[in-house]
Amino acid sequence: MSQKLVLILNCGSSSLKFSILDPKTGEEKLSGLAEAFYLDDARIKWKLHGEKGNAELGKGAAHSEALNFIVNNIFPLDPTLKDGIVAIGHRIVHGGEKFTSSVIVTDEVVKGIEDAIQFAPLHNPAHLIGIKEAFKIFPHLKDKNVVVFDTAFHQTMPEEAYLYALPYSLYKEHGVRRYGAHGTSHYFVSREAAKRLGVAEDKVNVITCHLGNGGSVSAVRHGQCIDTSMGLTPLEGLVMGTRCGDIDPAIMFYMHDTLGMSVEEINTTLTKKSGLLGLTEVTSDCRFAEDNYDNEDESLRVPAKRAMDVYCYRLAKYIGSYMAVIGERLDAIVFTGGIGENSAHVREITLNHLKLFGYQLDQEKNLAARFGNEGIITADNTPIAMVIPTNEELVIAQDTARLCIKD
């Protein structure tokens, strides 16, 4: 009997990430990215059984053309792929309060995703396009589509964690509250940490740090999220690649009233021109800050050090505050995501801020835990910090299989 495979779709406003996984073994058969949708140079790249390929999709191509290319041009390279796909999993950025776990797509579920568009105006419409196109291209799997929400893991937060100190009517009538993001990643690494530490999943206490171009920290007590750094939108919290994270809200009034900036200009500044990009005035790429932190060239060292120091200081503040929130035994601090998994420097500076709590970095272990490697990075007999590569696709595949595939 052929393997039962899951097709995973992550539709952005101008891109589509895709992969095919065996949910039992975690083996990735195919992965790829279609990007630059609606532009003249829309394109697709993929890796099939380790072999890379790429192609132009055509002027103005988008989600439909990308999915059709996958089916008509990539699948024939290995006919077992299409035959093996028995379900489709979709990553959804925002599920509002309605969804606390992954669910099979129904008309009611689609309505719920539509209702949450107000909180994710770029992402949720694109996710709905992905669902619609999947129905069209794989009609025999219409009842085998599952949505996995980035916000679901954070729905266990208590009221004191998710409410803003705003008029309560804004929450009651409009749903203005903290929702968080990266929940699938925080869920995965918290479970993996429990396994590695020999702690039951419903007992594990960890602080998980998902650090990539976007970044967030979550406090996980007894296996459940009790707080997270992102809020109503993914703008709140840590310093990120181009996002400012926490700021005094009155800065926006100053930008509007005194500097004469429009609401659109302010939004663009906070979401696309701030963070590491704003601090370095060069790039949103954390590697610039890491590579030039000790550069003899002052023009490179100063912006790199400024950005890195602010980034790590703010990260350490969140970790320290979440130690207080967890309020009991802390099993580990877990680093994941592109920066969390690969930047030994970010981890070093951050943990140096936490020496009060007994954290002592092991330099050799820290340098070893990069580029796909994992492990504990602190000295023996000291509080544990560790690196665990995330695998959101595996969570999506496993949730999809759990709901759709009968052994």
From Swiss-Prot:
Compartment(s) of residence: Cytoplasm
Subunit structure: Homodimer.
Binding site for substrate: 91
Protein task: Catalyzes the formation of acetyl phosphate from acetate and ATP. Can also catalyze the reverse reaction.
Annotated site location: Transition state stabilizer: 182, 243
Pathway: Metabolic intermediate biosynthesis; acetyl-CoA biosynthesis; acetyl-CoA from acetate: step 1/2
Sorted UniProt keywords: ATP-binding, Cytoplasm, Kinase, Magnesium, Metal-binding, Nucleotide-binding, Transferase
Any coiled-coil regions, as ranges: none
Active-site residues, record numbering mapped to chain: 150 (proton donor/acceptor)
PROSITE patterns reported for this sequence: ACETATE_KINASE_1, ACETATE_KINASE_2
InterPro entries, sorted: Ac/propionate_kinase, Aliphatic_acid_kin_short-chain, Aliphatic_acid_kinase_CS, ATPase_NBD
HAMAP family in alphabetical order: Acetate_kinase
Alphabetized SUPFAM superfamilies for the sequence: Actin-like ATPase domain (SSF53067)
The UniProt record lists the keyword Nucleotide-binding: yes
Protein name per Swiss-Prot or TrEMBL: Acetate kinase
Residues bound to Mg(2+): 10, 392
GO cellular component: cytosol
Naturally occurring in which organism (per UniProt): Mannheimia succiniciproducens (strain KCTC 0769BP / MBEL55E)
CDD domains reported in the protein's UniProt record: ASKHA_NBD_AcK_PK (cd24010)
EC number: 2.7.2.1
Cofactor or coenzyme needed: Mg(2+); Mn(2+)
Enzyme class: transferase
Residues annotated as signal peptide: none
PANTHER family, A to Z: ACETATE KINASE
Binding site for ATP: 17, 210-214, 285-287, 338-342
Catalytic activity: acetate + ATP = acetyl phosphate + ADP
Classification of source organism: Bacteria, Pseudomonadati, Pseudomonadota, Gammaproteobacteria, Pasteurellales
